Amino acid sequence: MTEQTQDENKLIAERRAKLEHIRANCPANGHPNNFDRKHKAADIQAEYGHHTKEELEGMDVQRSIAGRVMAKRGPFLVIQDVSGRIQAYAGKDVQKDLKATFQGLDIGDIIGVTGKLHLSGKGDLYVNMEQYQLLTKALRPLPEKFHGLSDQETRYRQRYVDLIVNEESREAFIMRSKVVSAIRNFMIKKEFMEVETPMMHSIPGGASARPFETHHNALDMAMYLRIAPELYLKRLVVGGFERVFEVNRNFRNEGLSPRHNPEFTMMEFYMAYADYKDLMDLTEEMLSSIATDLCGSTQLPYGEHTVDFGGPYARLSMLDAIKKYNPENATIQSMTYEEVKDVEFMRNLAKSIGMTIEKFWTCGQLLEEIFGETAEPQLMQPTFITGYPADISPLARRNDENHFITDRFEFFIGGREVANGFSELNDAEDQDNRFKAQVDAKDAGDDEAMFYDADYIRALEHGLPPTAGQGIGIDRLVMLFTNTHTIRDVILFPAMRPQG
């Protein structure tokens, strides 16, 4: 047992003893649930913070607040609620009347206070206690440095403590909630219908990823946590719902990184009688609108950069992006799609720039990996990358002029992908062939290749109208709006490796 653990255990024992003393002397103050909190700290500060001491005394304002004690300086307490902080003052009469509870009060305890508003000599508002109630005794002490936790692992594992002591964390998750609400409101105004599709699939599909597998006892069958809602959402478009969207979790049995968490939130939507260019226009409008509404500007700081959501956003093909960010590589500068179709040429090119490749990678996979290695990190400003090869886009419509590529884009900001969209493949026979190619790829060792979904083919055979669809990674988008650089900072309870 470390010295720190011994000290903490001692403090916990002391607090337990205080709680027992409170219960013995003031039974109602054990864990009461009858305090009527009528006001919040921030509302009080906003309404009365500009008044003088004399004005407040003349107004005779009575307020009832509740929250966590964050500091105790003699008779003054700093109380924190969801909106902010305000002080409370306990005069000698109050301390005498409530001696059993007030003297045993610790940082972290949750209390309710009623009294008149006053202004201190330093110009701070405070509630002069007339009534006081201990609502919850905190048995564990908060970190000594009241302004925050220094250990990142502890912040993620004990998010409840992080939220208590770190204002930046609270603000990040408030912003997350606002971003999700803003997206939802935007979609509803555009006449999209919000829907809910299954989280457990009998056949995983809609993305190239390893699924989590579970077992349904009653049906005695394997089930998979969904990796994407795409195939179900497109079934709804077949059924006649022309504009649908869903905000929900996806699960992918893959590694952890600053950009990846096994469960993450996506907003995925589909619109009939539209193509991938319409999606790009809609994305520009959405993000520009949300940035303006939530931040008051389309220009947001991100690390050492300023990201401009104002648009128009850059648009270039994957091949052109590789050429743009490899100006000194003569082979890349002269590369054509005919050469991209040559798997040996692409393997040699990847090896020449120091990449390690998998033997089952196709021409399209090699092109995407070269793009990811050399171009993607450079895409700080909002950029649509188009021209994704068909062999890595099994659900996307082929380009009319170049059948090697599809009418697909991925959207990048801050050097990472944030969204993926395309004109949907609605040719049932082409989809059938591409599913079969995915099965062959899986047999060759690609465990992220898709499964064959016969029911989805059946749905397409009923007729999917010309449709475009897109998924937006909420977590990565929130990282941009909160100027954070790891996905764990915007997921309340991220996946963590076991301790010890």
From Swiss-Prot:
Compartments it resides in: Cytoplasm
Top-level taxon of origin: Bacteria
Subunit details: Homodimer.
Positions contributing to Mg(2+) 2 binding: E417
Family to which the UniProt record says this protein belongs: Belongs to the class-II aminoacyl-tRNA synthetase family.
Reactions mediated catalytically: tRNA(Lys) + L-lysine + ATP = L-lysyl-tRNA(Lys) + AMP + diphosphate
Binding site for Mg(2+) 1: E410, E417
Enzyme class, broadest EC rank: ligase
Cofactor field: Mg(2+)
InterPro entries per UniProt: Aa-tRNA-synt_II, aa-tRNA-synth_II, aa-tRNA-synth_II/BPL/LPL, Lys-tRNA-ligase_II, Lys-tRNA-ligase_II_N, Lys-tRNA-synth_II_C, NA-bd_OB-fold, NA-bd_OB_tRNA
One cellular component (GO) term of this entry: cytosol
Alphabetized CDD domains for the sequence: LysRS_core, LysRS_N
Organism: Shewanella piezotolerans (strain WP3 / JCM 13877)
UniProt protein name: Lysine--tRNA ligase
Keyword Chaperone appears in the UniProt entry: no
